[in-house]
């Protein structure tokens, strides 16, 4: 798995890093859109099976030790630290696995393991990195789009 991570990092993520920095994310119709090469990076990590490394197979994961995820994360960070921040959001899956209901696990963990979804809100003016003080609320529209409302 680490060889695969190294291959993706060296041959796709690192060569894309300058273009990602130059283009950057942007707003389009009120939605944040990643740089186009970021989407290439996400697609490459999905195709390589680099999502859900430490999750049980029954949820679509690879059931590898967290140490493997940590090493893979460092390899990706060496190629592009900004992209590593996006890719490593999947580590939030551990909280869902430990504290979510079985219904929540079945609903969300396979999608995260497939690299289809993941999000996190951490910083607000009065919260900083204190997650208990974050005021963000997420609501789902009828069309399935999530709306984030906070400070």
Whereabouts are the PLM-identified features?
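Amphipathic, small/basic residue-rich leader segments at the start of a protein or domain
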Residues: 1-83, 103, 107
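Short, mixed-charge aromatic SLiMs
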Residues: 29-37, 98, 115-119
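Short hydrophobic "helix-edge" motifs at membrane interfaces and signal-peptide entry regions
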Residues: 45-46, 91-92, 140-141
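Beta-sheet entry/capping signal
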Residues: 49-52, 82-85, 117-119, 145-146
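Glycine-rich, Trp-frequent "lid" loop and neighboring beta-strands that shape
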Residues: 62, 103-151
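Feature representing long, continuous alpha-helical segments
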Residues: 70, 93-94, 106, 146
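N-terminal glycine-rich flavin-associated loop
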Residues: 84-102
């Amino acid at each position: 798995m680490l060889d695969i991570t190294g291959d993706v990092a060296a041959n796709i993520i690192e060569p894309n890093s300058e273009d990602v920095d130059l283009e950057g994310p942007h707003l389009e119709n009120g939605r944040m859109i990643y740089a186009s090469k970021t989407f290439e990076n996400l697609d490459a990590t999905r195709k390589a099976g680099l999502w859900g490394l430490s999750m049980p197979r029954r949820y679509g994961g690879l059931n590898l030790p967290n140490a493997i995820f940590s090493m893979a994360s460092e390899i990706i960070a060496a190629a592009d630290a900004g992209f590593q921040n996006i890719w490593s959001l999947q580590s939030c899956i551990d909280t869902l696995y430990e504290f979510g209901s079985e219904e929540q696990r079945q609903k969300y963990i396979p999608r995260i393991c497939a690299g289809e979804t993941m999000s996190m809100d951490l910083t607000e003016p009065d919260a900083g990195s204190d997650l208990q003080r974050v005021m963000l609320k997420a609501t789902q529209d009828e069309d399935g789009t999530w709306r984030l409302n906070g400070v």
